[in-house]
Amino acid sequence: MPALSLQQLQLINFRSYKCLTWDCRPGLNIIFGPNAAGKTNLLEAIGYLALARSFRQQQDQQLLTWGASSFQVRGLCHSNGEKIELVINYQQHNKRLTINGNRNRLIELLGIFPVIYFGPDDLHLLKGGPAYRRHFLDREISMGDRLYCRNLQDYRRILFQRNLLLRAIKAGRGKEGELEPWDIQLLATGKAICEKRSCFLQSLAPRVAATYRDMAGGEELALIYRPGVASQEEWAERLKVGREREVQAGMTLWGPHRDDFTFTLDGHEARYFASQGQQRAIVLALKLAEARYYRELLHVMPVLLLDDVFSELDEAHQGALLELLAGADQAFLTTTEVGLLPARLIQRSHLWELARGREPRLTSGPVEAQ
C-alpha cells in the first residue's frame, strides 16, 4: 500500500504561529510541551490541509493570528509515490488553493491528504447535539467523496433560498406556488445526501461494533442512522401538507439538515446510559474503524492526529490505539508530559519539544533508528 506523509509544514499568521517551518518525520511523532504552547494548533493546521477547513472552528476568521488579515498553510506531502505541494491562502473570507503551483478549486483538495483526528472534544459525538454529529458526517464523507461535497454545497444554497422565500411569503411578499421549483431541487439534492450518509454509516457500523467488541468484551455496540425523514415519499408529502407550518416558522422543517445518528449499547442509548469510560471507548472504536474504512476506500492509510488522548484511556484501550498506530505511515500525538505515554510508544517515536509560537525541536528519535 502506498505511503502517505507530511514532509514539511509552513504556517504564516495561523493561530499562535506568525511564521513557522517544520520539517516533519514519517512514522510516529510525539509533540510535547505545556498547555497553551500551540500543540493543538499544529494538529489543526495539518488537518486544514485535508479539507481547507478546521476541525475546531466553523469560521476561518478565527484562525488568524491576532492583528493579521490573512494566513497561509503550506504542506509538502508525499502521497502515492509523488511529492505534492498544497498551499491554502485565506484573506477577507476568501480561500485560494494551489496544488504544485497550479490554481485549483477547493474541492480538488479532497482525498489528496486524508487525516483522522481524535481529541477530547470528540466526546461531543455522543454528548453533543445533532448539529455536531451532522458536521462530523459531512466532514468525514467529503474527505473521500467530492460529489457528496458538491451536493452538500448545492443543498445548503437551495435551503437558504427556500428559507428566504418562506419568510417573504410570511411577510406577504411572495406566493406559496413559488416554492414548488425549490421543493423539486431540495428533494433531489437531499436524496443524494441521505443515501450517501446512510451508505457511509452502514459501512462503518459493523467495523465500529467489531472494534468495540475486541476492546470491551461482551456489550453489543450499534451505530444507527436517524434521518430527518423516513423516506423520500414522506418528505415530499410533508413539504406539501406542512407548508403553512413552514411559512409560520420561516424555515424548512424537514430534510437532511435535521438528520442525526446515535450509538446504542445492548439496545440502550449510549449517551444516557454509558459510563464516561464506555463513551471514550465508543469514540475510540469509531475513530479506529474510520481509519480502516478510509484505508480500504482510498488505498492509503490516513495521517492520524491524536490530541492528548492517551491520558484518558485505560490500558486495554491504549493497546487498541497502539495497534492502529503500528500500521500508520505517519501519526502526530500531543501530550503535556511524555512520561504519561506508554514506554513502547515513546521508543518508536520522534519526540518534539514545543514552546509557544516556536518551531518544534527534535529531542530524540525512535530507538530502532539510533
From Swiss-Prot:
One of its GO terms (molecular function) is single-stranded DNA binding. GO terms for cellular component: cytoplasm. Gene3D superfamilies: P-loop containing nucleotide triphosphate hydrolases, RecF/RecN/SMC, N-terminal domain. Keywords: ATP-binding, Cytoplasm, DNA damage, DNA repair, DNA replication, DNA-binding, Nucleotide-binding, SOS response. It is found in: Cytoplasm. Pfam families: SMC_N. ATP binds at G33, P34, N35, A36, A37, G38, K39, T40. One of its GO terms (biological process) is SOS response. InterPro entries: DNA-binding_RecF, DNA-binding_RecF_CS, P-loop_NTPase, RecF/RecN/SMC_N, RecF_2. The keyword Nucleotide-binding applies. The RecF protein is involved in DNA metabolism; it is required for DNA replication and normal SOS inducibility. RecF binds preferentially to single-stranded, linear DNA. It also seems to bind ATP. Belongs to the RecF family. This is DNA replication and repair protein RecF. It comes from Moorella thermoacetica (strain ATCC 39073 / JCM 9320). The gene is recF.
